[in-house]
């Protein structure tokens, strides 16, 4: 199969807002690829915006200057995948030049449509509305299977592409079960506006836990073998010896647990998230980092113990099993209550300890691997900033034809200009998209038919964010975490926008 077929399908999927049409287009492509398991795996990964190789060391810098496109499609899907694998294996002296040469060779053989697809895929910008449920439905349609069967296999296998390859080759998906050593998708939380809201949504009584601002880890132990996975299912065992040692100290043979790795100060207050995140880098000197930035691990759920799966067990039963196994120093603080005052006090104490909020877990909730359910709710304070829109990108998928992803700038009193601190396309309603498309045309600087439209720095926008982290991507050295639009501020002049110092104060 040619890369051209995948690129055209991606364009078609991005061009329609109809879920049924998206599913049908992807299913048709997968049906053509079946029963070739390698081909199916690659296509599902790519159209989900991911690479089977996960990381290949190619960033935007390597994609800035591209050769002219090829006149006719000739690249095959498997051939491109092989090239990407080769790029990902390069390391050491001269590898950057080799990587650049292979990228140039690949793009010179790609047509304009194929270049666009590869550019967005490698840059992490393939927003076409085909992730998650839509892709699972497409796999189910192509394989002639119930969507729930595909979703469960993907959930327990931790990989929709693997489930798709099995289903489209005629293999039974009921063989996908929780297996020690094979990561599964983590359960995710919805948001509650307050502890009172969480109590109401959980029927009056719930279990509150401290929400640590660390890194989610999934811990697998089979006898004396331990594997540690991130929330994106990357294996980081070698980078986290402290987590391995804490797991081996538990009186258990086989284990699958959910937890948080976090760097703490000497007084047990959390370090900035960036300190914890630095321990997960692929090139980190583990011994040196451990000496200067040691990690602690806190377990908060247990999914399997010594031959017994606990996914279907209620929260209370899983926590009882956790408490019987893990010492208190390795568990998060917890409160079971129906009293809003007690819940509010617990939240206040958690925030005072330096943590980011609380989780509320319904006592009867099952562990919904890979899904965002109401059984878990997160409650945390929200920071807001008034920033200036510096540029905007054209949308894709449902937002095709709309100016969508906005570039955000903080005011720099020293220069009188603005410093970019992030981007976001989150939180925008349809009405807001319509309004800003018109508004940004009015304040555009230069042409508006390119991917990025530059703007006069006149429009103030209020954004909510979860915090700030260090970043070399932006000139201010900082980036917003999980920024989303609250509203546009017609009542505010750019001179009233928050300064870069206000952003730094949140770090």
From Swiss-Prot:
Which controlled-vocabulary keywords does the entry list?
Answer: ATP-binding, Cell cycle, Cell division, DNA damage, DNA recombination, DNA repair, DNA replication, Ligase, Magnesium, Metal-binding, Nucleotide-binding
Q: Which Gene3D superfamilies match?
A: DNA ligase, ATP-dependent, N-terminal domain, DNA ligase/mRNA capping enzyme, Nucleic acid-binding proteins
Q: Does the keyword Cell division apply?
A: yes
The reaction(s) this protein catalyses: ATP + (deoxyribonucleotide)n-3'-hydroxyl + 5'-phospho-(deoxyribonucleotide)m = (deoxyribonucleotide)n+m + AMP + diphosphate
Q: What residues form the catalytic site here?
A: 211
The UniProt entry, under InterPro entries, shows: ATP-dep_DNA_ligase, DNA_ligae_ATP-dep_bac/arc, DNA_ligase_ATP-dep, DNA_ligase_ATP-dep_C, DNA_ligase_ATP-dep_cent, DNA_ligase_ATP-dep_CS, DNA_ligase_ATP-dep_N, DNA_ligase_N_sf
Keyword Magnesium (UniProt): yes
So where does ATP get bound?
Answer: 209, 216, 231, 260, 300, 372, 378
Q: Which family does it belong to?
A: Belongs to the ATP-dependent DNA ligase family.
Matching HAMAP family = DNA_ligase (MF_00407)
The name this protein goes by in its record: DNA ligase B
Organism expressing this protein natively? Mycobacterium tuberculosis (strain CDC 1551 / Oshkosh)
